[in-house]
Amino acid sequence: MLKDIYNSLLSKKQEESNMAAWNNEDILETQAQLFFSIKSIKGLKIMDNPIKVYCLASLEKQSVQTSSIVINKDQSQIEWNEGYTFDVISSKSILALSIWQGNANVTIANNSIEGGGSSNNSKLVGKLYIPFATFKKQFCDQWFPLTGTSQSVSIHVKTSFTNSSKKVTVDDFIFLRMIGRGAFGQVNLVKKIDTGRLYAMKVIKKDKCLNMNAVGHTFTERKLLKKYYHPFIVGLKYSFQTQDSLCMVLDYIGGGELFYHISERETFSEETARFYIGQIMLAIGFLHEHGVIYRDLKLENLLMDLDGNICLVDLGLCKEGIQEGHVTYTMCGSPEYVAPEIINGTGYSKSVDWWALGTLFYEMIAGLPPFYSEDPHEMTKLILSSPLKFPPQISKNAASLVSLLLNRDPSKRLGSGESDVEEIKAHPFFKNVNWSKLLNKEVDPPFKPHLVGPLDLSYFDPLCTMNSQPINPYTINSNLSDQDQMAFQGFSYSAPDIFLNNNNNTTTSNTNIGGSGSNSGSAQNSPYNSLRNTPPSIISMMKMSGSSGGFERMSPGHFSPISVNKQQQIQQQQQQHHQPPPLLQPQPQFWVQPQHPNHIPQPMAQLPILSKLQETTFERRRSLSVNAQTQFTLVLDPNEE
């Protein structure tokens, strides 16, 4: 009987392992939660020294590292009795449990990536995958054998699955710490009260979003994250809005920024870079397969989960619907990574992502982007015409891959053909990569982050995590007009026609913009409303149980020649309609149409724009040699620091 269950689980896991197939049809209609408990473990072979054993559990990128238990040689079966709760969004969810063991007498001395990038101090014992079809039963209580181990190790697992019709709102979260800051708001580390899971809540100020003409980018990110799921792309759990802010609750990816990890070593070995680049290729290839150009690939947009796998974040600059043979002209991205055709304004397609991949790969193995300069004017010239040079330690296969990706002719660039990412996979540099195992996270990462607890933010920028407080959406007051609010219609998940104002009262919207995702009664009478008035310093000190995972940073207002000056457009409109400027009244954002953002006119194709790029001043993100501030200071008002 046990063997049949084991074979059934393996078959089901193989059937559903391609998690990239998630779409709207797979999203559950109601909120669901899975409670699981690891009761005990048996079958471990212990030599002389006692070992410590812990479990990494994950579901939909929610991650938990259990406490460690010490096991001695004479113990054949060990009681564990530790349980957690996950939020379940999709019918294709898989509960993944991996058991790790290490010497109980060894303490991890540091978190840096040593040598070729491997500093894992624990050994994988085995894994267990429990698919949705199994745990959706109300209760499950049985022993499961672990896979991927030569030992006959089994764990006793109990699960309980529940559904709820309750809508998620701001009141369901405790605000703990600010972990990222951008042009339109900030990203907060939050704790979901009922499950204890950690998430990254992106709080976007509506007025700034309107002022910077970024409503379309915000809706694009929400739409793509809601529509698709991929193992190496951050997931959207919930979205809702208040009178003055938009909120997206995203996976918290606790291993921190890849930028941080490469800064610790200056470079990665080619073997380590191959692992990360391979996972990035799978994510970008998935987007291309669905007609999406990413357009902002860089180290800062790559996070590491607790297992050491990569997660792509910030889809705000993605471009949808570009058909084969067609191009787009909007200039956007980050200056070190933009392709020549973007700078020249000749039009570009999906191959700009492969140029950025080549730049990123070069940066991983050489330490800086290939055409980097402290002078942005000089850097654009280097991107357009400078010969590509390699340090002596770069292998021939690596140099060949970079050269093919950094071909200035986009039609001849590796990956520009109809087969897209498959062209790059076939390069000799990836000869020994098992792409199926890499996609299913069955390849051991070169480095596994070690955290001392769920609030360990060691791998994030301390300028954000230590010196700033989280922002509660209810504290934002922008006094937007009804016309302004129309731009945000449809942002919330299945929200009723209400939203909460700053006084915690319920306001009915005649524009049907969608609300915070709560009805008026539950919002007004919520026992957690008092948390809005709790000082952030006190909230951040609240004791919490069990979750660790990672985070997603907000995108800055990237440079773009199509960005409009709000005041100029207002004056033009007033002149056309012969209206005097209103006195002491909020200026209207007239370019926001009173309809769904999908109907906002698309920007026209731009003529060559090298001169416009050179007129823009950029601040280099944190580099290996200069302690510069991150890109998030690029568009921030100095008074808001």
From Swiss-Prot:
Domain Protein kinase: 173-430
Span of domain C2: 13-144
InterPro entries named in the record: AGC-kinase_C (IPR000961), C2_dom (IPR000008), C2_domain_sf (IPR035892), Kinase-like_dom_sf (IPR011009), Pkinase_C (IPR017892), Prot_kinase_dom (IPR000719), Protein_kinase_ATP_BS (IPR017441), Ser/Thr_kinase_AS (IPR008271)
Pfam family for this entry, one: Pkinase
GO biological process annotation, one example: intracellular signal transduction
Keyword Glycoprotein: no
PROSITE patterns from the UniProt entry: AGC_KINASE_CTER, C2, PROTEIN_KINASE_ATP, PROTEIN_KINASE_DOM, PROTEIN_KINASE_ST
Keywords linked to the UniProt accession: ATP-binding, Kinase, Nucleotide-binding, Phosphoprotein, Serine/threonine-protein kinase, Transferase
Polar residues compositional bias, start-end: 523-536
Keyword Ion transport tagged: no
Location of region: Disordered: 509-588
EC number: 2.7.11.1
TM helices/strands, residue ranges: none
GO MF terms, alphabetically ordered: ATP binding; protein serine kinase activity; protein serine/threonine kinase activity
Compositionally biased spans, kind Low complexity: 537-546, 567-578
Residue ranges annotated for the AGC-kinase C-terminal domain, each copy included: 431-503
Active site location: 296 (proton acceptor)
Expression triggers: Down-regulated by phagocytic stimuli.
Leading EC class: transferase
Residues that hold ATP according to the record: 179-187, 202
Catalytic activity, as annotated: L-seryl-[protein] + ATP = O-phospho-L-seryl-[protein] + ADP + H(+); L-threonyl-[protein] + ATP = O-phospho-L-threonyl-[protein] + ADP + H(+)
UniProt similarity note: Belongs to the protein kinase superfamily. AGC Ser/Thr protein kinase family.
PANTHER family named among the record's database cross-references: RIBOSOMAL PROTEIN S6 KINASE
Name of the protein this chain belongs to: Probable serine/threonine-protein kinase DDB_G0288795
Native source species: Dictyostelium discoideum (Social amoeba)
